[in-house]
């Protein structure tokens, strides 16, 4: 039986996004876009080749970024990610 939104768990979504481009929206009008390298049960997230976007403006690219889980608002596949 295919999974419907009612029975999809957040950690399953993160697991399926490993090694793919994701967009993370965090508190303070910030976003990070990069390759999901890892995460834990607290939603701490590690991205590779991450772009930091503040108020819609790209502020820089970093080799590796750790986003603290209590700042995460949502995580979604990046636009144009064909994986």
UniProtKB/Swiss-Prot annotation:
The keyword Ribonucleoprotein applies. GO terms for biological process: mRNA splicing, via spliceosome. InterPro entries: Lsm6/sSmF, LSM_dom_sf, Sm, Sm_dom_euk/arc, snRNP_Sm-like_arc. Residues 9-81 form the Sm domain. CDD domains: archaeal_Sm1. Gene3D superfamilies: 2.30.30.100. Transmembrane segments: none annotated. PROSITE patterns: SM. It comes from the Archaea. Keywords: Ribonucleoprotein. GO terms for cellular component: ribonucleoprotein complex; Sm-like protein family complex. One of its GO terms (molecular function) is RNA binding. Belongs to the snRNP Sm proteins family. This is Putative snRNP Sm-like protein. It comes from Thermoplasma acidophilum (strain ATCC 25905 / DSM 1728 / JCM 9062 / NBRC 15155 / AMRC-C165).
């Amino acid at each position: 039986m295919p999974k419907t939104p009612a029975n999809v768990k957040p950690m399953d979504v993160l697991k399926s996004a490993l090694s793919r481009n994701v967009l993370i929206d965090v508190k303070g009008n910030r976003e990070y876009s990069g390759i999901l390298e890892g995460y834990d049960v607290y939603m701490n997230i590690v991205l590779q080749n991450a772009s930091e976007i503040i108020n819609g403006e790209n502020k820089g690219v970093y080799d590796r970024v750790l986003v603290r889980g209590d700042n995460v608002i949502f995580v979604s596949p990046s636009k144009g990610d064909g994986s």
